[in-house]
Amino acid sequence: MNLSEFLAFAATRRPLDTEEIGRFMDEMSDSARRITFELNGSYHTPDEVRALLSRLFGYEIDPSVRVFPPFYTDFGRNIAVGKGVFINACCHFQDHGGVTLGDGCQIGHNVVFATLDHGIAPAERRKIGRASCRERV
């Protein structure tokens, strides 16, 4: 499975419960952890932070974006960040289902974006799927 296939499948909102999807999510999580450990492990200039986040997100983020580490994600490749975005310290992005921050968006300390959901009963917890929410404007 590749990133495009995963994102297309996740958009269908069907459970992410196949072995192939599980392996892919594990690989992406490992890659994201490597970069976030590097980001969060020592001081970096704002330009260095943006460079590390660009590696993590898979595209070059705008120079106007400002992020105060530590920053956490368990996927990294389904985050879209517009111009002039500010993300304060200790934010968590579970972005398998997608997180989009439009131009000028400001995120405070300790915010959690959880875009996956699973059943409450133990037998249903392996059936991970995209979380449902209503968009607020």
Identify what each model region corresponds to:
Residues 1-64:
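Terminal amphipathic alpha-helical/low-complexity segments used for targeting or macromolecular assembly
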Residues 71-81, 86-136:
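Flexible, glycine/small-residue-enriched loop-and-beta-strand segment within the central core
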